[in-house]
């Protein structure tokens, strides 16, 4: 499926026996859903299966849906309700439960689901059948639903809101999401990204099967395994998912096998949306001051440096690669959680979680890649970030990556130095306090204001000199100001960028603050797009 079509489908759903005594608890959970024959299962077996699959030719298993499902609207799709009496762990009466998504619209891949007894390691498949769903408020012709259509994905519920509000969702290709304490979904992760920014068209691998270990009754943690398949790669995944009170933490063990040479392999990919914000107003002609799921890419480099890269909604597609070795972490972050910053009572961007990746194995050399796609609104995700290994991936290669995913308001770690609080950009070339009614500046310039907070800035001795260190890949930066911001217990750095030629190529700006030889802050990176020369003027 084309990226835009896949994202449209996903965004439309944002609102959406013979066992030993030790296996009796799991058997009760099986009673309402799992109906297949018991078979042995473990992760080693799954890894071997994925590797063997990579040695064979890819077979596209997407199905032709009956017309009643293929032609349905997102509203009709969302109206199909899974019957909670048949949820995977219904009879467990515990802290967690799983329900399944119906196939339909663009979700044509039949995903196979299995229930696993963690003690006996016996797995039984849950087969699709119409009695698992409620079609009362839909126009679905159930007479057309013949055979085992499979499922489109699954969603996880947590007590005390079992069957009310899901906290984890796997749906479409290898996409998945989770919430934090607000219960609001936001950005998405993926199992794998292939050729997102490459010569050939992007490939979207599918999770084709899942195996769910039945958790203990009082546990808020469970394990699910997944088989991934695509024309270029296969994968065996183990997700240890911990649904904590304030966040969801996923411990991921990914074993990837290349069927073919892969130009760009994206590890721990995440997808978000940035339409406009405090520094980018081009698409913000609405009543909302800001519209975004994430406002920045945060990176904790292998050498210990912290980077803040504000996101853009560029006029043209932009790709940036940040080289690193054994990164300590990276993520797409939503730092501002104030309602006043968004004024949104429908999508609630003030409640969107951040997503942080923490490698748990040595990733070696590579780059954190950022793709920013032009978008005219908030209905399409336009931000993609992932890790790409430096070593080319050849057919037959097998790779293993371990990492944790933290779905929380803010990342679980942060720089001990001052951090970037906000970035603003606007008209430059004048002294602060100037009013447009007086006169316009004689020389065109672009002003940037970067606010820093934390890191002990509020405890610096009176009279401490704060030095902004700014570099630009093109043009000239000058007219620096250092302003105390008591409201955030920090400082605001302002400076103007002046063009020195007619180039409209992106300008890379870099800033941090120091006193004497001591670095005080993380590093701010920004990509600015100069207007055409004939636009560099005031009225």
From Swiss-Prot:
Q: How is it modified after translation?
A: Predicted to be exported by the Tat system. The position of the signal peptide cleavage has not been experimentally proven.
Q: Which GO terms describe its molecular function?
A: carbohydrate binding; catalytic activity
* Superkingdom assignment: Bacteria
Question: What is a biological process (GO) this protein takes part in?
Answer: beta-glucan biosynthetic process
Compartments where found: Periplasm
Pathway, per Swiss-Prot/TrEMBL?
Glycan metabolism; osmoregulated periplasmic glucan (OPG) biosynthesis
- Which chain positions lie within coiled-coil regions? none
Q: Name one GO cellular component term.
A: outer membrane-bounded periplasmic space
Keyword tags? Periplasm, Signal
**Primary location class:** periplasm
> Do you know which Gene3D superfamilies this protein is assigned to?
2.70.98.10, Immunoglobulins (2.60.40.10)
Its signal peptide is: 1-31
Query: Which family is annotated?
Result: Belongs to the OpgD/OpgG family.
Reported function: Probably involved in the control of the structural glucose backbone of osmoregulated periplasmic glucans (OPGs).
Q: What is this protein called?
A: Glucans biosynthesis protein D
Q: What is the lineage of its organism?
A: Bacteria, Pseudomonadati, Pseudomonadota, Gammaproteobacteria, Pseudomonadales
């Amino acid at each position: 499926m084309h990226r835009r079509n896949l994202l449209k489908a996903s965004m439309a759903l944002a609102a959406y026996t013979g066992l030993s005594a030790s296996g009796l608890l799991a058997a009760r959970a099986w009673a309402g859903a799992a109906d297949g024959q018991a078979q042995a299962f473990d992760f080693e077996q799954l890894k071997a299966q994925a590797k063997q699959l990579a040695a064979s030719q890819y077979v596209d298993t997407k199905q032709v849906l009956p017309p009643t499902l293929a032609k349905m609207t997102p509203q009709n799709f969302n109206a199909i309700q899974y019957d909670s009496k048949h949820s995977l762990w219904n009879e467990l009466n515990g802290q967690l439960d799983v329900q399944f998504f119906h196939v339909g619209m663009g979700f044509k891949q039949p995903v196979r689901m299995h229930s696993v007894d963690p003690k006996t390691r016996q797995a039984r498949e849950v087969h699709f059948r119409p009695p698992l769903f409620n079609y009362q408020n839909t126009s679905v012709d159930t007479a057309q639903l013949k055979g085992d259509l499979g499922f489109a994905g699954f969603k996880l519920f947590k007590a005390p809101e079992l069957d009310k509000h899901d906290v984890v969702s796997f749906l479409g290709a290898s996409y998945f999401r989770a919430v934090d304490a607000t219960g609001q979904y936001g950005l998405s992760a993926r199992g794998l990204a292939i050729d997102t920014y490459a010569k050939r068209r992007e490939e979207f691998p599918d999770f084709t099967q899942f195996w769910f270990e039945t958790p203990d009754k009082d546990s808020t943690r469970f394990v699910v395994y997944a088989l991934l398949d695509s024309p270029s790669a296969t994968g065996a995944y183990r997700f240890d998912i911990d649904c904590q009170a304030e966040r969801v933490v996923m411990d991921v063990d990914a074993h990837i096998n290349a069927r073919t040479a892969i130009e760009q392999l994206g590890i721990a990919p995440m997808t978000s949306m940035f339409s406009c914000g405090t520094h980018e107003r081009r698409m913000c002609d609405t009543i909302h001051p800001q519209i975004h799921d994430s406002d920045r890419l945060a990176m904790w480099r292998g050498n210990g440096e912290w980077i803040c890269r504000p996101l853009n909604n560029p006029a043209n597609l932009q790709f940036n690669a940040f080289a690193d070795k054994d990164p300590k972490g990276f993520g797409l972050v939503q730092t501002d959680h104030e309602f006043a910053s968004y004024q949104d009572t429908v999508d609630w961007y003030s409640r969107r979680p951040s997503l942080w990746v923490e490698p748990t194995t040595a990733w070696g050399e590579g780059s954190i890649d950022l793709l920013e796609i032009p978008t005219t609104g908030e209905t399409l995700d336009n931000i993609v970030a992932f890790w790409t290994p430096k070593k080319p991936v050849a057919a037959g290669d097998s790779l293993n990556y371990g990492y944790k995913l933290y779905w929380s308001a803010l990342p679980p770690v942060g720089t001990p130095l001052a951090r970037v609080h906000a970035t603003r950009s606007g008209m430059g070339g004048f002294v602060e306090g100037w009013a447009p009614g007086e006169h316009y500046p004689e020389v065109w310039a672009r002003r940037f204001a970067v606010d820093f907070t934390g890191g002990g800035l509020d405890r610096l001795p009176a009279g401490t000199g704060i030095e902004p260190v700014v570099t630009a890949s093109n043009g000239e930066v000058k007219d620096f100001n250092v302003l105390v911001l008591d409201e955030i217990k920090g400082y605001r750095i302002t400076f103007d960028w002046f063009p020195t030629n007619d180039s409209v190529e992106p300008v890379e700006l870099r800033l941090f603050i120091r006193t004497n030889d001591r670095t005080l802050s993380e590093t701010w990176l920004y990509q600015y797009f100069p207007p055409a020369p004939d636009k560099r003027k005031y009225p």
